[in-house]
């Protein structure tokens, strides 16, 4: 059992968005900018934008807001902040190259990122969540983790997979929470998280000369 229900969580989200208005609109713009930067090969910019969002969600949502309802929120928040710090460090080193190369992995990554940016808030709304509480990547943890997994698939390989571990772990925790709260689309997150991580680790097919 959790110390809150779905109604309390979405009420907290609405309060959070109102406190930092116009956060939802800024998150939408952030998502478009990050997706464009990653697909175009501006790896450092995209990684820094992901880092900023992860730190923001960890500090502003989990630690400053959600901790009032969930005793585990500060732990989750710390993990998001750590993920953001690692992303920023990797961006500074320039070791991970993001680019849309029309590989199967890239199409999946692009689809996952778009699903997080457009599909997640849309399904929230169609599920009866009022607009002030609708979750978007860059502002709320579930779509932020899903969006990050999609963006990082544009790199693939073990270096990108290492960056995907914490977001993938979050999808498992969020899926369990979604099951308890009866939020259907949250329950699918572990499948997406594990599949994205496995795809990142899958070797690229060799091109025959």
Cite the ranges covered by each PLM segment:
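N-terminal topogenic module of multi-pass integral membrane proteins
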Residues: 1-68
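Hydrophobic cores of alpha-helical transmembrane segments in multi-pass inner/ER membrane proteins
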Residues: 23-36, 78-93, 141-155, 189-204
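Short hydrophobic alpha-helical membrane-embedded segments
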Residues: 24-29, 51, 55, 138-144, ...
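Membrane-interfacial loop-to-transmembrane alpha-helix junctions, especially the N-terminal start
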Residues: 41-51, 102-109, 156-167
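Aromatic-anchored segments of alpha-helical transmembrane domains
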Residues: 52-60, 112-123, 168-179
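Loop-to-transmembrane alpha-helix initiation sites
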Residues: 71-77, 180-194
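Membrane-proximal helix-loop-helix units in multi-pass membrane proteins
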Residues: 72-149
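Membrane-helix boundary connector in multi-pass membrane proteins
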Residues: 154-165, 172-186
């Amino acid at each position: 059992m959790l110390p809150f229900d779905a109604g309390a969580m979405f009420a907290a989200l609405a309060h959070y968005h109102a406190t930092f208005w116009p956060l939802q609109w800024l998150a939408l713009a952030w998502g478009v900018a990050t997706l464009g930067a990653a697909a175009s090969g501006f790896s450092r910019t995209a990684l820094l934008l992901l880092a900023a969002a992860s730190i923001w969600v960890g500090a502003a949502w989990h630690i400053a807001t959600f901790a009032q309802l969930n005793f585990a929120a500060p732990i989750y928040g710390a993990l998001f902040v750590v993920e953001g710090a690692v992303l920023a460090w990797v961006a500074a080193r320039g070791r991970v190259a993001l680019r849309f190369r029309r590989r199967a992995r890239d199409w999946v990554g692009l689809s996952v990122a778009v699903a997080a940016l457009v599909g997640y808030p849309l399904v929230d709304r169609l599920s009866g969540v009022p607009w002030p509480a609708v979750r978007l990547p860059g502002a709320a943890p579930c779509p932020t983790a899903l969006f990050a997994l999609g963006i990082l698939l544009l790199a693939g390989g073990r270096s990108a997979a290492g960056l995907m571990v914490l977001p993938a772990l979050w999808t498992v925790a969020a899926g369990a929470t979604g099951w308890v709260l009866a939020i259907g689309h949250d329950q699918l997150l572990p499948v997406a998280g594990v599949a994205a991580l496995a795809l990142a680790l899958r070797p690229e097919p060799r091109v025959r000369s």
